[in-house]
Design a protein with these regions (language model features):
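Amphipathic, interface-forming alpha-helical segments with heptad-repeat character
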Residues: 32-35, 53-168
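Membrane-cytosol interface motif
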Residues: 33-48
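Alpha-helical membrane-targeting segments
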Residues: 14, 49-56
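Single-pass alpha-helical transmembrane signal-anchor segments
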Residues: 2-21
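Aromatic-capped interface at the extracytoplasmic side
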Residues: 17-32
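Single conserved hydrophobic/aromatic residue that forms the stacking wall/gate
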Residues: 170-178
Length: 178
C-alpha cells in the first residue's frame, strides 16, 4: 500500500463515520428510511444510522402550530361576512408515521375542513347571531377537525374565531323576500 493511500482511506472512513451520526432537535421527530422503505422514527438527541444505506426522509415538528384561515360566506339575512378562524394543532408523538406518510399537505386539508364547517354553520345564522355564537362555530370546527385529522396523526388543540368582518356590500333582496 502506498503512502498516499493510507490518509485517503483514513479520510474516507472518517467521512463515513460522520455520516452515521445526526441530531434531532427537541420537540421534533425524524423519519428514517432504508433504501426508500420506512425503517424507524427517531426522537430528539444524537442519533445513529447506517451511512449510505439509511437516510433521514424527513422531519416533523411536534410543537403546537397555528393556521389562520379566512372564510367568506353569507348569513341567513343575506349579509356577506368574512371570518378569520385560527386553528392550533400539533403532530401526536405516537402518530408521527401517520402524519408523515398518510397526509401530504396538512395545511390544505385543515383549511378544507374549516371552509366546510363554517360554510355549513354560518348560513343558518343571522349576522347578530354570528357574533353571539362565535364560540359555537369554533367548537363545531374543532369537533369536525379533530375527528378527521386524528386519523392522520394530528391533534387539534384549539380553534378560535378571531375576527368577524361583515362586508359593507349587502345583496339585494330577492322578489320572494319582499
Amino acid at each position: 500500500m502506498s503512502f498516499f493511500a493510507l490518509p485517503i482511506l483514513f479520510f474516507l472512513g472518517f467521512l463515513i463515520l460522520l455520516l452515521a451520526f445526526f441530531i434531532v432537535k427537541q420537540q421534533s421527530a425524524a423519519v428514517i428510511e432504508r433504501f426508500g422503505r420506512f425503517q424507524s422514527i427517531r426522537q430528539s438527541g444524537l442519533q445513529l444510522k447506517i451511512p449510505l444505506i439509511d437516510r433521514v426522509a424527513g422531519r416533523l415538528s411536534l410543537k403546537i402550530q397555528q393556521l389562520d384561515v379566512i372564510v367568506e360566506t353569507k348569513t341567513l339575512d343575506d349579509v356577506f361576512v368574512r371570518l378569520k378562524i385560527s386553528v392550533q394543532y400539533k403532530v401526536v408523538k405516537e402518530k408521527v408515521y401517520e402524519a408523515f406518510y398518510k397526509l401530504d399537505y396538512p395545511h390544505e386539508q385543515i383549511t378544507s375542513y374549516v371552509f366546510d364547517v363554517v360554510r355549513a354553520e354560518v348560513p343558518k345564522m343571522k349576522l347578530d347571531d354570528v357574533f353571539v355564537k362565535k364560540d359555537d362555530i369554533a367548537i363545531a370546527v374543532k369537533t369536525e377537525l379533530n375527528e378527521a385529522m386524528m386519523d392522520y396523526g394530528y391533534d387539534i388543540i384549539k380553534t378560535l374565531v378571531t375576527d368577524i368582518d361583515p362586508c359593507l356590500l349587502y345583496t339585494s333582496p330577492s322578489p320572494r323576500d319582499l
